[in-house]
Amino acid sequence: MKHLKRWWSAGGGLLHLTLLLSLAGLRVDLDLYLLLPPPTLLQDELLFLGGPASSAYALSPFSASGGWGRAGHLHPKGRELDPAAPPEGQLLREVRALGVPFVPRTSVDAWLVHSVAAGSADEAHGLLGAAAASSTGGAGASVDGGSQAVQGGGGDPRAARSGPLDAGEEEKAPAEPTAQVPDAGGCASEENGVLREKHEAVDHSSQHEENEERVSAQKENSLQQNDDDENKIAEKPDWEAEKTTESRNERHLNGTDTSFSLEDLFQLLSSQPENSLEGISLGDIPLPGSISDGMNSSAHYHVNFSQAISQDVNLHEAILLCPNNTFRRDPTARTSQSQEPFLQLNSHTTNPEQTLPGTNLTGFLSPVDNHMRNLTSQDLLYDLDINIFDEINLMSLATEDNFDPIDVSQLFDEPDSDSGLSLDSSHNNTSVIKSNSSHSVCDEGAIGYCTDHESSSHHDLEGAVGGYYPEPSKLCHLDQSDSDFHGDLTFQHVFHNHTYHLQPTAPESTSEPFPWPGKSQKIRSRYLEDTDRNLSRDEQRAKALHIPFSVDEIVGMPVDSFNSMLSRYYLTDLQVSLIRDIRRRGKNKVAAQNCRKRKLDIILNLEDDVCNLQAKKETLKREQAQCNKAINIMKQKLHDLYHDIFSRLRDDQGRPVNPNHYALQCTHDGSILIVPKELVASGHKKETQKGKRK
């Protein structure tokens, strides 16, 4: 037995035997129950290998280290093997597991972690101390229970050290040999869950009470500090008040000022002059809900925010003054600035001495802090009034000179039309040029436009539709003294004056028409000269000689009418010769036109002629094919007749005549002779030669 035991402990023979049996597909259960190790080592091996539920290691008589006396090689603080121990036992377990399905057991531990507020650190330390004391007492009890279980033969000493919260359960449990091993994990998890829920309830209640106390204290401090600051600002001059606000803004950015409220912000903005509002950026505007993390948003701030938006908000300035770098400071600043409304008081319409009407902010601040954290700029801009966009349009025009809000409001009230012309709009002062000057010729044109009136032709005066020419009363000339007026209205040259829909009852323009200069005669003469340029050479000559007939009449008259016309009027020889030349050239021109017309007609009809010829050609081809077919039929019939005749003919000896050697020849008297083909061929050759000679 000792030899066998030493052989097994060496791990040689038993390893070879088990390997061979596992490869052969047999599972042999060796009767080694008489050689069981002490129960402590057996239970320790069962726990290390997965518990008693593992069927692969249920019959192992060896310890985890591979021998009987090697239980001391285990690490004292863990289940892992000692690195100095030999790996024979591990190899034995791996070989023994061959051919056996292994299902791993996965254990998941869930831990509920909750944050403790900064102000309740003392209470949290007290709770942690109590928990530590209870865990210490439980650990001692569990150790005692574990030792009793080991003495009983089957307890797990490490199951008692699984957690400090299992102490009560271990003390109440009886000292069974191995019955408590599978249930230790379940009982411990249940007790851990119950105790954690109790601790969470206590922590939540204490945190809630402490938060309420801190909020009330911070509210009182902020109100007192705001009152002091307001009193100081009211007593100091404007420049000292600006310094105070700047220092407060810097203190807010550095995190030292935690009692800045929205009501104080609006009062400071309303107390500052107009010019100082332009330098305030939205990055310096805080909200009460984003100043301190522990501050509850259920504080009672009352300001009517909708009225402030609809009256004194300039969205355009708010967007332009918002810096980009204010959103890159730190995560807390980013979350706080995302809650800031992109709004600012309008510096053009705000009275510096006027305060905000109303003190109700319940419509803006929600009672829950989570709602304030989720509030974005889109939610704030959702309730904006339409008047904001009207103010934006007005402010875009206010930068220009000679701005009149009443006229601009009337301009925005005009309805638009689909054609792009305001046909229903009323005549207002913002129109650039009145109806009397809508067709004016200005000395100051656009860049690259020729301003010399003498270089412009009559085509420049044509109207937009149908070549309309304006009346002389509608034409005016702007003197050089009005250049200042045009300098003020330079930006208005883009607009058009569509006032031709005015009713007769509409008042006439107060502006008097400019005096008509002497250049109108030049324009008219230039127009006449241009029309003369369009005349032909004959018309110009007839006009120069004062011939009382038009060129068309001279050319188109019949011969009798032309001669009578020349006899009725007293004309000089030069006029008569010119008239005859004009008539001759006109007739030649008409003849040439007729010739060209005939040629064009021929060219146009040539295609039809070609088509007709092609059709005729196809008809002739069809007729030729039919004639050839008829000729071939006649030849075939003649050939058949030859064979029939020669089949009936006989020579002197009574033999049939060969049609290949003889041929039939008709004479002039109608008789038929049988002639050899050689003679017929020679006779044809002689005839052909005679024909060639001729």
From Swiss-Prot:
Residues 333-357 have a biased composition (Polar residues). One of its GO terms (cellular component) is nucleus. Residues 193-217, 231-254 have a biased composition (Basic and acidic residues). PROSITE patterns: BZIP (PS50217), BZIP_BASIC (PS00036). Keywords: Activator, DNA-binding, Nucleus, Transcription, Transcription regulation. InterPro entries: bZIP (IPR004827), bZIP_Maf (IPR004826), bZIP_sf (IPR046347), NFE2-like (IPR047167), TF_DNA-bd_sf (IPR008917). GO terms for biological process: integrated stress response signaling; regulation of transcription by RNA polymerase II; transcription by RNA polymerase II. Pfam families: bZIP_Maf (PF03131). Residues 133-256, 330-357 are annotated as: Disordered. Transmembrane segments: none annotated. Highly expressed in human placenta and also in B-cell and monocyte cell lines. Low expression in heart, brain, lung, skeletal muscle, kidney and pancreas. GO terms for molecular function: DNA-binding transcription factor activity; DNA-binding transcription factor activity, RNA polymerase II-specific; DNA-binding transcription repressor activity, RNA polymerase II-specific; RNA polymerase II cis-regulatory region sequence-specific DNA binding. Residues 578-641 form the bZIP domain. Residues 133-150 have a biased composition (Low complexity). Residues 580-599 are annotated as: Basic motif. It is found in: Nucleus. Residues 606-620 are annotated as: Leucine-zipper. Activates erythroid-specific, globin gene expression. PANTHER family: NUCLEAR FACTOR ERYTHROID 2-RELATED FACTOR, NUCLEAR FACTOR ERYTHROID 2-RELATED FACTOR 3. Heterodimer with MAFG, MAFK and other small MAF proteins that binds to the MAF recognition elements (MARE). Belongs to the bZIP family. CNC subfamily. This is Nuclear factor erythroid 2-related factor 3. The gene is NFE2L3.
